[in-house]
Structure formats: structure tokens, C-alpha cells
Amino acid sequence: MSFFELDENSPKVDQPHGLKKVKLKDHQLTSIAAMRELETQASIVIDKPEIGSKFHASVGYCISDIEEFKDSTFVIETNSAILADKVGAGKTYTTIGLILKALVPKAHDRHITGTDNFSIKMISAKECEPVNLIVVPHNLINQWADFLDKSKLKYLKLNAESDFNAFLDIDYITKVYPLTREQISCKPIKNKPKKLPVKTTKKGGSKTQNKAQNDQKIYERKSLNMKKIRQALDTHNVFLLNVYRYKLFRQIFLTNKRKWARVIIDEMDSSAVPSIFDEYGNFNWFLTATPSAIFNRSCRRYVNKIFGQRQNLLNYFVVKNKEEYVDKSMILPKPFVFMINTMIQRVVAVFKDLIPQEVLQLINSGNMKEAITKLNCDVDTEENIIKILTGKINTELHNLETELEYVNNLIPQDVDAHENRKKNIMNNIARCKTKLESIKEKINSIKDECCFICTDPFENPTIMNCCKSIFCLKCLLTTLKTVGSKCPYCRHAIKSNKDYQIISSGGTSNKKKKSEIVGKYKFNEMDKADVLEQVLSYISKNDENPKILIFSDYSQTFEKITKNIAKANLQYAYLSGTPAHITNLITEFENGITNILMLNSQNFGSGLNLQSANYLILYHRMLPELETQVIGRAQRFGRKNNLRVIFMVNDNENRDCRLDSKPINILSDSELWMITNPTDLNEEPDEESDEGSDEDVEKSKDKKSSDKKSSDKKKSEKKSSDKKSSNKKNSKKKTYVKPKSSKKTSQKVKKTDSDNESELSGLSDSDDLDDSDDLGILSDSSDSDDFGNLSDSDDLSDSDESEIEIPKKSKKTSKSSKKNKIGGSNKTLKKKAPVRKLIKV
């Protein structure tokens, strides 16, 4: 049986008896069946493995005959495996169901040692304890306790130090003695109670002696009580252990080594399993959604004990359902995904290729102090990053020049080798000087704010992704049209507007078409913290009960953005502290007392159940595996409503999305209504639709957002247009408007009607903006409602003598315009409509 890709055709078990009001899903029953079979047979059969497979890479070197290898059947004997269902699939309940099905799994012979010709197995006569040891991270122990309370299992929670008193005797003494083997600790009491049974060596005496005895230090001594230990083992099915308390746990059970029924470690990929961990059971289970990561964490020593260095064989030890089967079994509501592009510092944008990825990640998270520390800089400014980068090159240059001077003073034994060494050093010196000169030129170009093309101060400065050169946006667009869509500096082909980045320059702002970005605040011109403030403020005003999770890899990030979060008038908290404090914070969040919960993804990115949240914000991009874990905190078993996932990304961060939902770009504050009311959005366009249809969708989104924001203004405009139309009706002759330059106008309209999208997207738009200002051309924006909508059959004449009639506004046209907006019929989105432009009266 294959345990790696379980599906609906795989065997299932019946609902385990002992779960209170919890019915397991089909995929969970399938996992329990596979886990029970693996525990029973303790072996995995591999029949006729392929040459070149991971199994062949691991064991093929032991077999010289390839034909024998291909035709053979292999058996892996194991007492350890990994439950690796996807994030949020309910692995905790699956594990509890496994224990309820069989409290103690079958014991198997243990391989001790051997060679190719013999092996030694141990048939152990030692019986295991009827207790399942579950080791969990400190932030999940109360969550596990809540799940165990929903079953009939009897468990002992070992979280605080006082929980271990169930195994100990405690007495109080005034004098410290060396600890015996049965004694665990002897510590002084800080707050001495009034009445305490203290053992003293002397009795009686004067009042002064008694007073001196009262002033003596009192020590609390803890000793093992074997009867209490035995009683705890006999009366409990599960020991629930905080991984941070393992040292104390080991002290108690080290004197008499125990063999457990099962050892289960939750979140094996992120749990801080200590190096001294040495617990085994009849069968060992590790729970994680990312099994490949267990070799890279602090538990690597324990994992290597079990699996050795056979990482290629890891999939054979994994019990996992197919993700399609899990999705079908759970039927979770599909999340809405939003992308908000924010502004990165201009200097960082230019030199992002020279900044280490680790430091760039810190900058993206807003953790500039840590970024400066990584670069050995003292002051928190972007300019210092450039100084450090040039300083490293200067240091390398100095070392090379010193080495060249040293080599020149040597008396060579091999002249050719000596000359080659000098030549290599000189080439490296030239490389450093060129690199340093290039950086200085870029710095001067930014500080002087002078365009290479027009030699004037920058207007809408734009950085090329190919060579990091900076130009005015207008100069760049003009040059791209004349030289054939190539970079003016390095001649690299420019295929779309993604090949360059428009950045802010002091007080100037990016001039974009109103149809592209509508709103008071354009997010690509704002700092990430300010954008977060706008998003939270909008949610606060338009959602009665917001529950928001904000994740970042760094705790220092939250120190910076707390001021912005506070301005949103929402109650917020940072998740940290003891398990009891964490549980209280989560309870307040679920009850709506706290609206925003800030979490460090490194500490709380896995394991927690936070499906009550309706918004999840990733403040910066993380590792793909970690992002999956983070989103799984809310998108998991038990969720009923659609989750809104918001990615906040800078220009240098990737925009890939591993979720099934297609990301929706939020460009300004006027489009934030899509976050709070995602159900008003139309269905996604077909995959076959081209870029033109996507642009129409974006325009329709902008149209609805602008209409929604300025409805009062539209009413007044409609009234004025109605008055104009009534005046036109009174006149017998039709009114015609002739453009200033009919040739240019007809050519311009003809070009847009043909949907010539072979040109650069974004470049022609910017150019059209300049032309539209001169000719009075309106784009397909909110202003076009004053003139009505052109149908597909309407044609615009190309001749100089042609005149364009202004269509009359009627009720039919107003109804059709409403359908074109987001939230209307789906047909209008799926059909590719040409972009119409009208002549202003």
C-alpha cells in the first residue's frame, strides 16, 4: 500500500468512539486507516523501483547488478513515520482519533546492527507504558488541551513547573544538603509564607535563638515519589508535554528509562526539540505540513537518529492525502487574495541588486534598524546603505592593491605563474574600480536629479530594471517609440511596462491616467506602513466586527507600525508570552474584544487555530513554505466564511501567489471597497482572455470605485447634462462638433478602436495622456458617462470633413453603463470590448 498519495479510494476506518460532538472528515478517517496499517505491519514495500529514482540514489550503490535491482522488491522496516497532510487539514484530531482506535500499538523487533551478510535483531521483553507522549510547542499546549477535552482520553498536562509536582514530594529545610539521585532540586523560597512545615535539627532554646531561626533562609526540596509516578502512568492515557519543559521531564524519568506507547511530536519542522531529547515508543509519529524542512531545524539531531542521512527516502515514510481529496473532504470557502504594491525607497530600488537578500528582506519588512545592523552601519538612513556598499568595494580594492604591491616585491621562481597572478590581481582591481565608478555615477544622477536624455531635473523619474539607469518618464516613452522599444542606455529590449519602475522624486508624484488609478491616495507612491494605516482605517469604518491577523518575520517590524495601527481606532495586541497569556489573547480575539492580532511568523506561523479571523495581512513576502503555514492559521478546518488574504509587496518583492484564487490588484484607497465587499466582484475572467480583457476589468473596477466614491457629484453632472440635452431637443438641427485637428483626432481614435495591443502596455497609455490633454480626448473613465456609451456598431470617420455626432443620453444607455460596472452581468467582462474615446465638447 502507498501511504504518500491517499485518495477517496483508499481504505477508511469507522468514526472512533470517544470523540464528543466531533465527526471526523473522510480524509481524516483515511489517514487513521493508513497509520494503523503502518503501525501494524511496521514495513513499507517498494516493488521494482525505477533506475534513477530517489530510492535508487539512496541504496543503488549497495547493489552492483542493475538488472537485479530493477526486478527486485524491497522492504523498509520502520517504527517511525510522518503525518504530512496540508495545512489546516485537522492533523490534531486525526492523531487523537488514532489514539482512540488503539491506545497501545503493536511492538516490533528492533534491528541492532549487521552487515550485508548478517543482521542482529532484538526481541524485547520489556513492556511499554500505556501512555502516549505528545510533545508540542509552548504556544500550542493549551490548544491541544482543548482538543483532548473533546475526547474521552485522560491526559496530564505538563506545562508549568508546578504541573510536575504530580510526580514529586516537597519538603522545606533550613540547611542545604547535597542532592541525592532521587532529589530533583533544592531552591530558596523568595516569598516565605507564615506557616510552613520546616524541618529543623534543634528544638527549644531561647527567644533570641528562635528569632534567629525565623530569619534563616528556607529551601524547597523536591524529591521523586515512585508511587506517584506509577499512579500517574496507570491513570492517564496521554502525557501532554511542553517541549521547553523536557529537561525537567527527563530528570524525573531518567532514573528508570521508560518506553512509551507512542511518541508524537507536533510541528516537527518548527519545534525546538532539544539535542538531549531521547524518547522512543512502540511507534513514533511526527506531525508537519512540510516534511522536507525537518532536516533543517533544531531537531536535526533527533531526526538523523531515526532517518539517518537518507533524505531521499523521506517520502516513503510520509502518510499524506492528496490535496484535491482534502479540499473535497473539507469544502472550505475559497479565499479572496489581494495584492497591494507599495513604494520602496528610491535609493534602495536603484541598488537592490547590490544589497544582500537577507538585508533586503529586512528593508521590505520595515525593519531598517536591523538592516543597518547587518550592514555594520550606525545611522538609520538609506544613504548609509550606499556608503556601506561602496565601503565594501573600497576595502576589497585596498586589499587587492596591497596584494599587488606585495607580489611585485617577490622574487619569482616561476616567471609565468608570477605574471599570471599579477594579471589576475590587476583585472580584479579594474573590476572594482569600474563597479565603484558606476555606483558613484548613479548616486550623482540621483542627487543631482538630472535626466540623461533631456539633462533637466527629473520629472516622474523612472528606473530601468535592465541596467538601473534613470530617465524622465516622458523622455523614456519618447525614446522607446523612436528607437524601437529598447533601453536608451543598454539597448535591452523593453517588452512591457514591467521592465521599468516609476518612482517618486521629492514632492513630485507619478502622473498616471485617471482611468488607471483613481483616488486620493495612490499606494505605489506611499510607504508600506502608511498604506497599512489606510487599509486598516477603511476596514474599521466599513466592517462592524473586523478580526485581522498581521504577520511578519521580525518582531521589530511591529514596533515601527504600531503607531499606524493605533490610528485605525481598532483594539490590537501582540501575541507573545506564556501559554496562558497566549490563550487569553486568542480568546479575546475570538470574542471580538481585540480586533488586530500581530504575530511573528517564525514563532506563531504554524499550529495555531485562528479560523475566526476574516482578514489576514502578510506585511512582506516570506518563504513559500512559511507563507503556506501562515495562511493556514485562518484558512483551515472549521472555517465558514471567505478569508481575505492581503499581500503587501514592494517593487523588489515577488508577486507570485500559490493560492488557487487569482490575486486582485488594489491601486488606491478608492478600491479598498473590494476588500470589505469582495462578494460584489464579478466572477474571474476566463483564462483564455488576453491582456486587453484584463485591462477592461481593471477599468470597470476603477469605474465602479469612482462612481461609488463620488455619487453626489455624478448626480449634479447628470442634471447639467439633462439640461443641455433638453436645449438640444428644442433645436431642429443636430449639433455637430468638429475637432481642432481632424486628421490627428481620427487617427488617434482609429488606433484605439483597432485595439492595437501589440505595443507596450503602459507606454502608449502614458503617451495618450499627453495627447489627450491637447486634443480634449476623454478616456473610458467616469467622465464618459456624460456623453453616453458608444455601441460596437458605432464608427468614427477618418476623413478630414467627417463630423462626430454627440449621442443623446437616454435611460437605456444609463442601464447598460451600470451593467458594465463591477457587480453587473458576467458577460460584459468576458467579452473583449474595444476602448472608446470621445471628443470633449
Swiss-Prot record:
The keyword Coiled coil applies. ATP binds at D85, K86, V87, G88, A89, G90, K91, T92. Transmembrane segments: none annotated. The keyword Magnesium does not apply. The lineage of its organism: Viruses, Varidnaviria, Bamfordvirae, Nucleocytoviricota, Megaviricetes. One of its GO terms (molecular function) is ATP-dependent activity, acting on DNA. Residues 72-309 form the Helicase ATP-binding domain. Residues 195-205, 726-749, 809-821, 828-841 have a biased composition (Basic residues). Signal peptide: none annotated. GO terms for biological process: DNA repair. Residues 195-215, 678-841 are annotated as: Disordered. It comes from the Viruses. This is Putative helicase R592. A zinc finger (RING-type) spans 451-491. It comes from Acanthamoeba polyphaga mimivirus. Residues 681-697, 765-774, 782-804 have a biased composition (Acidic residues). PANTHER family: FAMILY HELICASE, PUTATIVE (AFU_ORTHOLOGUE AFUA_2G09120)-RELATED, TRANSCRIPTION TERMINATION FACTOR 2-RELATED. Pfam families: Helicase_C, SNF2-rel_dom. Keywords: ATP-binding, Coiled coil, Helicase, Hydrolase, Metal-binding, Nucleotide-binding, Zinc, Zinc-finger. A motif (DEAD box) lies at residues 266-269. Its EC number is 3.6.4.-.
